Amino acid sequence: MQVILLEKVANLGVLGDVVKVKDGYARNFLIPTGAARRATEKAVAEFQARRAELEKVQAEKLAAAKAQGDKLAGKTVSISQKAGVDGRLFGSVTNADIAESLKALGFDVVKAQIRLPNGPLKTVGEFPVSVALHTDAVVEITVAVVGEHV
């Protein structure tokens, strides 16, 4: 299916690109989230008329994400979990736990924006974690997992 992108989509294209994607990806993800529209002649003409407005909205989103990223960059979030004597946690620290801690500090972050490259954190220590506030605004924070010894 041919779609026209209404925003930047990772590994696919940028605003205004007409790309061919699988029908299910377009129908179930891109179109419902507002990231794309079917690339009919009418839709392409309508997009060209609104292109400047859409580019302005995208630039504002990016500026807001970068501003939040500047405040968030380099922060250390401390999370305490029950742990054994050897430093392994009973359970794990997930992206939802990190997002909850960031919300407590006043940052508007959802769990889907937290990137844990090696999966959930299962040991005590400090770990670098990426937070993708926008496709072009990714910042690094440090998560300090503190063990509550049982």
From Swiss-Prot:
It holds the Pfam family Ribosomal_L9_C. GO terms for cellular component: ribonucleoprotein complex; ribosome. GO terms for molecular function: rRNA binding; structural constituent of ribosome. InterPro entries: Ribosomal_bL9, Ribosomal_bL9/RNase_H1_N, Ribosomal_bL9_bac/chp, Ribosomal_bL9_C, Ribosomal_bL9_C_sf, Ribosomal_bL9_N, Ribosomal_bL9_N_sf. The keyword Translocase does not apply. One of its GO terms (biological process) is translation. Keywords: Ribonucleoprotein, Ribosomal protein, RNA-binding, rRNA-binding. NCBIfam families: L9. Binds to the 23S rRNA. PANTHER family: 50S RIBOSOMAL PROTEIN L9 (PTHR21368). Belongs to the bacterial ribosomal protein bL9 family. This is Large ribosomal subunit protein bL9. It comes from Leptothrix cholodnii (strain ATCC 51168 / LMG 8142 / SP-6).
